[in-house]
Amino acid sequence: MTDAVRTLKEWTDAARKIVFFGGAGVSTESGIPDFRSTGGLYHQEWKYPPETILSHTFYKSNPEEFFRFYRAKMLCPGAKPNAAHKKLAEWEREGKLLAVVTQNIDGLHQAAGSKQVYELHGSVHRNYCEKCGKFYDLDHILHTTGVPRCDCGGVIKPDVVLYEEALNDRVIDGAVNAIAQADLLIVGGTSLNVWPAAGLINYFRGDRLALINKSPVPRDLAAGLVITDPIGEVLSQL
């Protein structure tokens, strides 16, 4: 155990209101590619850049191509929770963790047993008809081809926040409230480049901020503790 991990262990042992703020790096150890790392989605070949395909405009104007990309690149139904997801769920069961705030849409925190999860960018597990509002699960999207349609004829849209779309106010309020109450904020697996989500950590009022990410991020200087190891590997030692 490194000195930094040992310090983090002391912090987590003493904390009573941990909030975890996570991004794509949390799920890479479950085999889900992140967006911006080498080998991530933004470095893969496609007819259009991912930022374009995953926009509201593209979804509306070219739904066939959107869903082809979405099924091929955004859905990983075989992924399982890793050590990071499991440790966070364990802390919640012990009453040490207030909430998980995640930029991920994979539902792996819930699969690990976490209950209080604020999904800033939505979830692939929720899909709704744009016409009548009927709910469809992930299996329905996986087992249809082309543009998925409801019995009423409406397009079934994944409940994920696309570029050009606003975040859910209720989710934001819950995340802000949790972060403001935290006595320890652990930020993991995110480059903090996606706004407005990254701005939420400004609501943290405590003095113990730990940052776990494989590459340096803009907030390194503000963090009391910076660890550049895989997050599952780090949390499993705590």
Predicted regions and their residues:
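Conserved catalytic core of sirtuin-type NAD+-dependent deacylases
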Residues: 1-238
